[in-house]
């Protein structure tokens, strides 16, 4: 019988010693976690931990409110 396929869990890109800080002013970093339409990509796709995903979404929403990021992209 064949072994069932399983995916290796990716590590969080914001954990570790040299990990980048989540900041609402760092637009280039935040755009990496948004879809091409401007939506926040879920953590199961980006492998971000739950705590860091909350910080990330808060930073994206803050940057949107200030006007650094668009709400939607047409």
Curated annotation (Swiss-Prot):
Cross-referenced PROSITE patterns: RIBOSOMAL_S18 (PS00057)
List the keywords (alphabetical). Ribonucleoprotein, Ribosomal protein, RNA-binding, rRNA-binding
Q: Which domain of life is it from?
A: Bacteria
Q: Spell out the InterPro entries in the cross-references.
A: Ribosomal_bS18, Ribosomal_bS18_CS, Ribosomal_bS18_sf
* One GO BP: translation
Disulfide bonding pattern of the chain: none
What PANTHER family is this protein classified in?
A: 30S RIBOSOMAL PROTEIN S18, SMALL RIBOSOMAL SUBUNIT PROTEIN BS18M
Protein purpose: Binds as a heterodimer with protein bS6 to the central domain of the 16S rRNA, where it helps stabilize the platform of the 30S subunit.
The family note in this entry says:
Belongs to the bacterial ribosomal protein bS18 family.
User: Mind telling me what this protein is named?
Assistant: Small ribosomal subunit protein bS18
